[in-house]
């Protein structure tokens, strides 16, 4: 899986759903780190308060040494409806630059099925075309995690699956509940107890001719979900995915509504947590 695809996977993990009484957007800043350095920053706005509607918007850009592998700066998001507990996107749009080249994708969903309205560059970077049959029934990556998170908000579990298509490739994603963990403190990142969701993603369409066999292999990751502050909906507070360039990538929730995330954790500083000076393993199993 390419570096940009792994960034999308990280981003795919940065969304959640719940139903608090007051409909207020939740603004979050995430740091994505690999090899001990920040490689990307993400600013996200979650509007997940309505029982039947959702909207997720984000801006993300590569930082530091990651720019050596190709600078990227993007913005966009999705909006949609919940039908029977399932996310049904109505529009997905992302635009920005990758290695100095303009990129844009717009998907609409008439009749609930994805239709690619805009794709730049039009040659799709030399990838094989994705057939309508492979697109059928898919949703975008933000909506996929919104659906997963709605299940967590409803029953405390994250067991589910989805086909993800963002205009380039099709990925099958399956998630499963893996218990509860204590998130280790690091810098100003959120710390506390969270639900652990293990997930598997496997690309099944949209390959390049020169992709090696590893691109087709299942990729395992973990997302830890929790309410970042009292009264807020649960969102990803830490995420880990593998990376060929950096070994692994870790996503840290650093700020919520303009406040350092570690200052908002309702159970931060408890006897189960410990301090750290570097980027530690994400969590330890809760007793």
Model regions and ranges:
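Bacterial N-terminal signal peptides that target proteins for export
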Residues: 1-9
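Cleavable N-terminal signal peptides
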Residues: 10-11, 21
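N-terminal signal peptide c-region/cleavage motif recognized by signal peptidases
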Residues: 16-20
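Acidic, serine/threonine-rich low-complexity disordered tracts
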Residues: 24-111, 154-287
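A charged, solvent-exposed segment within the mature domains of Sec-exported extracytoplasmic proteins
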Residues: 112-179
């Amino acid at each position: 899986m390419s570096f940009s695809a792994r960034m999308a996977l990280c981003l795919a993990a940065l969304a959640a759903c719940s139903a608090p009484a007051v409909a207020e957007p939740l603004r979050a800043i995430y740091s994505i780190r690999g090899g001990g350095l920040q490689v990307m920053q993400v600013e996200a706005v979650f509007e997940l308060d309505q029982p039947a509607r959702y909207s997720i918007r984000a801006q993300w850009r590569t930082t530091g040494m990651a720019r050596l592998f190709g600078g990227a700066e993007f913005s966009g998001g999705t909006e949609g409806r919940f039908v029977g507990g399932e996310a049904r996107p109505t529009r997905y749009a992302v635009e920005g630059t990758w290695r100095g080249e303009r990129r844009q994708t717009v998907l609409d969903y008439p009749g609930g099925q994805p239709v690619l309205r805009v794709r730049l560059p039009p040659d799709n970077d030399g990838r094989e075309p994705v057939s309508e049959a492979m697109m059928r029934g898919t949703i975008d990556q933000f909506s996929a995690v919104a659906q997963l998170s709605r299940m967590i908000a409803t029953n405390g579990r994250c067991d589910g699956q989805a086909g993800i298509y963002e205009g380039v490739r099709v990925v099958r994603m399956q998630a499963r509940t893996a218990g509860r963990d204590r998130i280790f403190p690091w810098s100003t990142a959120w710390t506390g107890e969270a639900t652990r969701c293990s997930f598997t993603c496997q690309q099944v369409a949209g390959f390049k001719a020169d992709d090696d066999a590893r691109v087709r292999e299942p990729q395992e990751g973990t997302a830890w979900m929790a309410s970042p502050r009292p009264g807020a909906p649960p969102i990803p507070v830490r995420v880990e995915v593998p990376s060929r360039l950096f070994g692994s990538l870790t996503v840290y929730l650093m700020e919520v509504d303009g406040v350092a995330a570690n200052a908002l954790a309702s159970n931060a500083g408890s006897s189960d947590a410990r301090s750290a000076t570097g980027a530690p393993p994400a969590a330890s199993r809760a007793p």
